[in-house]
């Protein structure tokens, strides 16, 4: 696994990047230098602009490009029990609480969260915004801000609340 991040280039979140490096993740500046083989797959969030050198390099050499949401949805949708948490606010708290309840109940859920989950923090996982389980249960935030919520097919859907945060009411009705 290799990667780049504008926060790395800006000197932010050094402890997170040091943690990744210590586990063998090769980090590159976000200048395209890490995208060198057509066999590579570039995974980026929808917040990464087409003008970012990594995206341009991937296009130039013919490397596959996908979004974080598409990759996450593929993993999420393949779980036997998928629980998607949506809404304008409270998603991270709900995912963290549900993940912890399932964990304490003896389940081994995979969890993808938008924030660190304090109950799961330990020396091997000091940030704990994600947890790899046994694949049976997958609990994740699903985001409506960029429309990627439509990629997810949860077996259980939790909608905390809906307000005019990222989309118009008509767009929200279509997504939900």
Where are these regions (language model features)?
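Short acidic low-complexity segments
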Residues: 26-38
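Cofactor-cradling patches in redox/metallo enzymes
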Residues: 25-28, 44-45, 54
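Phosphate-binding loop of NTP-binding sites
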Residues: 34-37, 46-176
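Residue-level detector of anion-binding/catalytic polar loops
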Residues: 1-2, 26, 64, 108
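Structural motif
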Residues: 6-8, 44-47
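Short active-site oxyanion
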Residues: 1, 39-41, 136
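NAD(P)-binding Rossmann-fold cofactor-contacting core
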Residues: 2-17
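Structural/interface elements that position substrates and couple domains in central-metabolism enzymes
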Residues: 9-12, 27, 76-78
């Amino acid at each position: 696994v290799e990667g780049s991040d504008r926060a790395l280039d800006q000197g932010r979140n050094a402890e997170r990047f040091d943690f990744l490096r210590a586990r063998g993740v090769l980090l590159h500046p976000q200048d395209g230098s890490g995208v060198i083989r057509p066999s590579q797959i570039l995974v980026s969030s929808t917040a990464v602009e087409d003008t970012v050198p990594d995206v341009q390099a991937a296009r130039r050499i013919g490397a596959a490009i996908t979004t974080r949401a598409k990759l996450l949805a593929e993993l999420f949708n393949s779980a036997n029990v998928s629980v998607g948490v949506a809404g304008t606010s409270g998603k991270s708290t709900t995912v963290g609480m549900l993940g912890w309840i399932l964990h304490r109940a003896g389940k081994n859920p995979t969890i993808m969260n938008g924030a660190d989950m304090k109950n799961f923090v330990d020396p091997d996982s000091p940030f704990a915004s994600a947890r790899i389980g046994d694949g049976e249960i997958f609990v994740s935030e699903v985001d409506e801000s960029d429309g990627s919520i439509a990629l997810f097919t949860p077996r259980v859907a939790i909608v905390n609340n809906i307000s005019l945060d990222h989309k118009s009411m008509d767009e929200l009705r279509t997504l939900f």
